[in-house]
UniProtKB/Swiss-Prot annotation:
Record-linked Pfam families: CitG (PF01874)
Protein name: Probable 2-(5''-triphosphoribosyl)-3'-dephosphocoenzyme-A synthase
Catalysed reaction, written as an equation: 3'-dephospho-CoA + ATP = 2'-(5''-triphospho-alpha-D-ribosyl)-3'-dephospho-CoA + adenine
Organism: Pseudomonas savastanoi pv. phaseolicola (strain 1448A / Race 6)
Function: Involved in the formation of 2-(5''-phosphoribosyl)-3'-dephosphocoenzyme-A, the prosthetic group of the acyl-carrier protein of the malonate decarboxylase.
E.C. number(s) listed in UniProt: 2.4.2.52
EC top class named in words: transferase
Keywords: ATP-binding, Nucleotide-binding, Transferase
Family: Belongs to the CitG/MdcB family.
Database matches in HAMAP family: MdcB
MF term (GO), any: triphosphoribosyl-dephospho-CoA synthase activity
UniProt GO BP: prosthetic group biosynthetic process
Keyword ATP-binding: yes
Amino acid sequence: MSALQLTPQAASLAERLADLAVDALIAEADLSPKPALVDRRGSGAHTDLHLGLMHSSALSLWPTFKLMADAAGQFNTVGQPLREALGRLGRDGEATMLRTTQGVNTHRGAIWALGLLVTAAALDARNCAPEAVLARAASLAQIKDRQVLVQGSHGNEVVRRYGVMGAREQAQQGFPAVRDFALPQLQRSRAAGSGEQNARLDALLAIMTTLSDTCVLHRAGIEGLHTMQRGAQHVLDVGGSASLAGRRALNQLDQQLLALNASPGGAADLLAACLFIDGLEPALGRVSRSV
């Protein structure tokens, strides 16, 4: 059962946005076959993750996303107070996630990306076109959270070591992987009659073609990143996941990434962001504007 089915029809805007965020996370986890990622087939390149844990983690974040949307209604403008409220809520949400998963990092990157997007959507529910929401999210991400000292993380270490764009920079630029690659590919594959699951797989692959995925870089270095990018492009070049040649290439990419222990977790987070953005306008036409 999806989060959308758990919320009454008279749901507030904040509740509906939380539903959409959780549903995007669950849809990303369920999508199969994803190369070297947790899906319905198994745990991919991970030893500490499984599909049930991904579901539990996603559901545990519903209150966090709702509170973020509520904060947007409270402050009603992009600025330092809202940015720092989001930071506090995100840290609380991460603590909840870690309690739920017994210390396993399932969705830290997704809390950042989807938290910004939920808040950006709540700031102006009457203008939830992708470009508008992504621009508002970028404005929020560009504001420094003064309550946070610079912290070490695998992602930050990789950004410094390789000089690539990390999750923070991706958000500050308006999620170009979503705006310029995932959403257009999702629409192209749907228009080609590929089917929804294949269209979503193609959107994931489109992200993977150019993303400097810090999860892959951390686990497999430059070799892993190039294998991911070139392999994803090859799948799309031979017809995408709906074609026989594309499925063969996708299976080959899966095996290559597994051999390198490289899991494209950053791309998975951005696919969830893509699915959230894609669902906004259809869903918000059916909800109350009250928060």
